[in-house]
Amino acid sequence: MKTFDGRALATSSNEALRTRLEQNTADGLITAPVVIAQGLSDIVVPPSATDAYVEERCSAGQRLEYWTFAGRDHFTIVQPGAPLEELLIRWTMARFANEPQASGCVHKSF
């Protein structure tokens, strides 16, 4: 993990933080509907880290939707009016309407 100036945040010199970040990873199957959104220009949570997490979760049998957004970063992905806003509202409304989530792992690019 890196900070905005490029220095690593979770380094061996910050072992307590690195250990806590590793512990703070969901590794059990989640029975509720799951969607993960990732800005492809994100430098706070790099897309490669989310890709690896999604791949690991899918290999473990987790059902989820993984949405990636070109040109969006950690902050612009959630700005009012960003594409995620309407997509997430529609996705959530569908879940409350008891419409099933897509089966397996589905990756959509926006």
Model feature map: region roles:
Residues 1-27:
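Accessory cap/linker subdomain of secreted extracellular hydrolases
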Residues 10-14, 27, 43, 47, ...:
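Solvent-exposed, acidic/flexible segments
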Residues 18-19, 51-110:
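C-terminal catalytic histidine-bearing segment of alpha/beta-hydrolase fold enzymes
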Residues 25, 34, 79:
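Solvent-exposed, flexible loop/coil residues
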Residues 27-30, 59-61:
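A structural signal for short secondary-structure junctions
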Residues 30, 35-42:
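Short beta-strand/loop motif that positions the catalytic acidic residue
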Residues 32-34, 46-56:
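Short alpha-helix in the alpha/beta-hydrolase fold that links the catalytic acid
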Residues 40-45, 75:
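Acidic catalytic loop of the alpha/beta-hydrolase fold
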